[in-house]
Amino acid sequence: VLTAKEIRIQQPRLLELQLRGAVAVHSQGILREDLLRIELSGVGQVVLDLEVVELLADLRGLGRMEFKGKADNIRLEINGPGLVEARQLKVRRAQIFIDGLGLCRLDVSDSLLADISGGGSIRYRKEPPTMLIRINGLGSIAAWDTDENGGPTRSEMAKGDFWSGRSVKEPKIPAFELGF
């Protein structure tokens, strides 16, 4: 049963997703595309299971994007205090641009281009062979500390992660489910 705030969309192909305001999007199943563009502005949440050649994601505001699966190339832009959680997304080449206090965690294997202005942070599983880094401000980039399963340790989760341990509650937002 769907309420007025829930919509279920079944679409054979999804090439672009533009979201504004307080909204949540969760995929049911794996989204397979050559190119996928995602733009989230506001206090939203996007959780997608992907197999893509190229992912272009733009996060503006206090949003959260969570990706898992595979991507050959990703280009992420975070403006503000947003979070991109991509530890479970196997990426070959990544370009990450952060302006503000954003945080990105990813698993990149071949190359990483990182550009941070402000206090943003990038955490990667293992240092790729090719890295090009520019930091203007108090930003940081480093490998995350891992436990025996390859996940972050408790101390790593506390470093720069504004989603854990905050005193304010996350807002209730309407949910959209996408079936592929």
Q: For each predicted feature, which ranges?
A:
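Intrinsically disordered, low-complexity terminal regions
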Residues: 1-180
